[in-house]
Amino acid sequence: MTESTKIKYCRADSGSGSKPLSAETKTRLMADGKKIDEEKKDGTAVRRVLFWFAVLVIRFALLMAMHYYHDVTSSRCDGARAGGARTGRSALSRVRGRRRGGGTPDTRPYCDSGTACLDFRKGGCNHGDACEFAHGVFDNSSADLA
C-alpha cells in the first residue's frame, strides 16, 4: 500500500465508518517535512512568522513606552513648567485631581527626583513641597545592598 492510499481514508470521529479526508488534513498527516516545504513555497509560514514577530515587537515597544512614561524623573521641581505643561507623576496627580471632585485640578508641585534630600534626613527641610530633592523613607544602611 502506498503512502497516498494510507492517508486517503481515515476513521471519522463519530465512529460511523470511513470517510475521505480533506486536503488540509492530508497535508497535516504527511511526514518528512513535506508540509513545511509546501508552506515555504506558498509563503504562509514566512507570513505567520513575520506576523508574530510584528505582534511581539509592537507589544514590547508599547510596554517599554509605558514603563518610561511612568518612570520620568526631573532634576528640578518648580511646579508649573513652560505653558503649564507637566510630566510624569505631576501630570498624573493633576488628572486624578480632576477625576476626584471634578472641581479644580491638583496643582501642587510634585518632585520626581530620586536623590534624597539631606536636610530632610537630618530632621527638617525648609523648602517643603517645593524642594527639588526627594522626601520620604530611605534605607540608610548600605550593608543590605551587598
Curated annotation (Swiss-Prot):
Zinc finger annotations (C3H1-type) as residue ranges: 111-138
Region (Disordered): 80-106
Keyword field: DNA-binding, Metal-binding, Zinc, Zinc-finger
TM ranges: none
Recorded GO MF terms: DNA binding; zinc ion binding
Disulfide-bonded cysteines: none
Cited SMART domains: ZnF_C3H1
The protein's name: Putative zinc finger CCCH domain-containing protein 29
